[in-house]
UniProtKB/Swiss-Prot annotation:
Quaternary organization: Homodimer.
Alphabetical list of PROSITE patterns matching this protein: TIM_1, TIM_2
HAMAP family: TIM_B
Cytoplasm found in the keyword field: yes
Name of the featured protein: Triosephosphate isomerase
Cell compartment(s), UniProt: Cytoplasm
Keywords associated with the record: Cytoplasm, Gluconeogenesis, Glycolysis, Isomerase
Matching InterPro entries: Aldolase_TIM (IPR013785), TIM_sf (IPR035990), TrioseP_Isoase_bac/euk (IPR022896), Triosephosphate_isomerase (IPR000652), Triosephosphate_isomerase_AS (IPR020861)
Gene3D superfamilies: Aldolase class I
UniProt family annotation: Belongs to the triosephosphate isomerase family.
Gene name of the encoded protein: tpiA
Length: 248
């Protein structure tokens, strides 16, 4: 049985003070959660948020990282730095990174490998555009992404990582994939993992849905057999909304 995982991606929101206030408010609301709870603040908020979640069931993730340990990469953060801080998870290959920062599947794969070297659990994002969905090439696109994103990993690593299926057309648009669409597509992603690493590994990989997840949509989504959680954007910025999702 896979343990559900709900992660909040705060994106470029919340000052340090606001981040601490949000986590303070969140802690009592999610203390009895039956799923893994993760918050992913901005880099500058990580130390304060890590301090605030001590003793609670909330884990902390970063929103990105570089694949090198150090070097002349102005503005970047290395996995070594995240590991030293005590970060547990790291989002890799979010559609906004792919869209605005030209991140490729090859880059994603380098980051995934490096994350494991530093005891970080990657939340690997994949998804198709509206054009690709309407052109009936969703499966082809996702297979292409997964086969590169997850190449040359050990079975143990693949079992540990989290995949987030986020249809790009449903991010921040208010549009969502139907529960059936999400379940079917996540099931397909699992078959791609199976073709690479076998049935046993594929059955253990946790695959989230991401794309305008709200308190009103989560229950039906989580009732689907293939969906193991959610990567939540805007709704993770309010303790009331995020806790309602976590306590689905």
């Amino acid at each position: 049985m896979r343990t559900a995982i709900i992660a909040g991606n705060w994106k470029m929101n919340k000052t340090v003070k606001e981040a601490v206030e949000l986590v303070k408010e969140l802690k009592p609301l999610v203390k009895d959660a039956k799923c893994d709870v993760v918050v992913c603040p901005t880099y500058v908020c990580l130390p304060a948020v890590l301090e605030e979640v001590k003793g609670s069931n909330i884990k902390v993730g970063a929103q990105n990282m570089h694949f090198e340990e150090s070097g002349a990469y102005t503005g970047e953060i290395s996995p070594k730095m995240l590991e030293e801080l005590g970060v547990h998870y790291v989002i890799i290959g979010h559609s906004e990174r792919r869209q605005y920062f030209n991140e490729t599947d090859e880059t994603v794969n380098k980051k995934v490998k490096k994350a494991f070297e530093h005891n970080l659990i990657p939340i690997v994002c994949c998804g198709e555009s509206l054009e690709q969905r309407e052109g009936n090439v969703t499966e082809k696109v996702l297979e292409g992404q997964i086969k590169v994103d997850l190449k040359e990993l050990s079975k143990e690593q693949v079992e540990k990582l989290v995949i987030a299926y986020e249809p790009i057309w449903a991010i921040g648009t208010g549009k969502t994939a139907t529960d059936e669409q999400a379940n079917e597509t996540i099931g397909y992603i699992r078959t791609v993992v199976k073709s690479m690493y076998g049935e046993d590994v594929a059955s253990k990989v946790r695959i989230q849905y991401g794309g305008s997840v709200k308190p009103g949509t989560i229950k039906a989504q989580m009732a689907k057999e293939e969906i193991d959680g959610a990567l939540v954007g805007g709704a993770s910025l309010k303790a009331e909304d995020f806790s309602a999702i976590v306590n689905f």
